[in-house]
Every structure is written in structure tokens, then in C-alpha cells.
Amino acid sequence: MDYGYIHLIIGPMFSGKSTELIRIVKRYQIAQYKCCVVKYLKDIRYGNSVYTHDNNHVSAISTTLLYDVVDKIMNFDIIGIDEGQFFKDIVSFSENMANMGKIIIIAALDSTFQRKEFNDILKLIPLSEKVTKLNAVCMECYKDAAFSKRITKEKEIELIGGKEKYKSVCRKCYFLE
């Protein structure tokens, strides 16, 4: 049996995770691999596509549980997953698919706006052949930013949004009001 692998791309908001996911998927497409991308169903900002903040995009399959779309993706070699932190079954799905020979590329936030682990996404680190941690630019002081800071009053963990709700910040600016 051929084994696949897991590539986990993590970082804060605006660090280029989706851009990197799309770049890798498009590279595999050029190499004649059959590729698909899965996105989180509740992220309705861009319809049935994954968009980057600079308007690059690919079409995607939308779902809230990855196992719900297994039948749609089994014929693909490469499975890209955007916003991986939102999928409750991300760990078992990724491990099972990689063990079946699929290449799984996941873009995900590594922490919440409270700097706590985001659901089970960090459990993929010991299961991944490759982990890429990206930084953004601090939207306050322009240094490297490793954190996402919510700029609205909502308290729930799952709050989908962009610059209207979040900014990327460095350690120092995270604690500034």
C-alpha cells in the first residue's frame, strides 16, 4: 500500500495560509495530479471557492464534517483543506486519508483569538510529515505577527470574519488595548 502524507500549514489570520494552500494545490495540478479543495460550509463569504485576501481563488467542496464528503473526494490524489481548525473530524480524517495514500494539505489557525489551541488542530502536528508555521505582519507596529486579535466584542470561539473582526499582532501589541 502506498502511504500519503499530511502537510499542516498554521499561523494567525492574514499570514498567507490559504495562499500557500492554493499555491501547493496548483503546483500539483500542473504535475497532473487530481486535486480537490474542501472548505468549511459555514464560511459563506466567498460561495463555493476558497479565496485569499489578495483575491486568488480555487473552487471547493463545502462541508462541516470531512467524512460527509468522502465519496466526493476518494478519486482525488491531493486533498486541500482550508480553515481546518473548524472541522471536528480533522485529525481522524487526515490520518485515515494519508494512510490510504492521499496527500493532505491543511491550512488552519493554530490558536484562537485568546491564544489558546484551536479545537484539535494541534493534535495533527505529531501526525504530520511537514508543518509550516507562518507569521503575518503586525497591523499595529509592522513587526512579525504570530497572533490573531479580535477587534469586536463577540466572545464565541467560532466567529468567521476578516479585517472587520480581526487583526494580526505581535506579542507586545496583543496586550495593548
UniProtKB/Swiss-Prot annotation:
GO terms for biological process: DNA biosynthetic process; thymidine metabolic process. Zn(2+) binds at C138, C141, C170, C173. The active site is at E83. Keywords: ATP-binding, DNA synthesis, Kinase, Metal-binding, Nucleotide-binding, Transferase, Zinc. SUPFAM superfamilies: Glucocorticoid receptor-like (DNA-binding domain), P-loop containing nucleoside triphosphate hydrolases. Pfam families: TK. The lineage of its organism: Viruses, Varidnaviria, Bamfordvirae, Nucleocytoviricota, Pokkesviricetes. GO terms for molecular function: ATP binding; metal ion binding; thymidine kinase activity. Belongs to the thymidine kinase family. This is Thymidine kinase. InterPro entries: P-loop_NTPase, Thymidine_kinase, Thymidine_kinase_CS. ATP binds at G11, P12, M13, F14, S15, G16, K17, S18. It comes from Sheeppox virus (strain KS-1). Its EC number is 2.7.1.21. It catalyses: thymidine + ATP = dTMP + ADP + H(+). Substrate binds at F113, I157, E158, L159, I160, G161. It is an enzyme of class 2 (transferase). Transmembrane segments: none annotated.
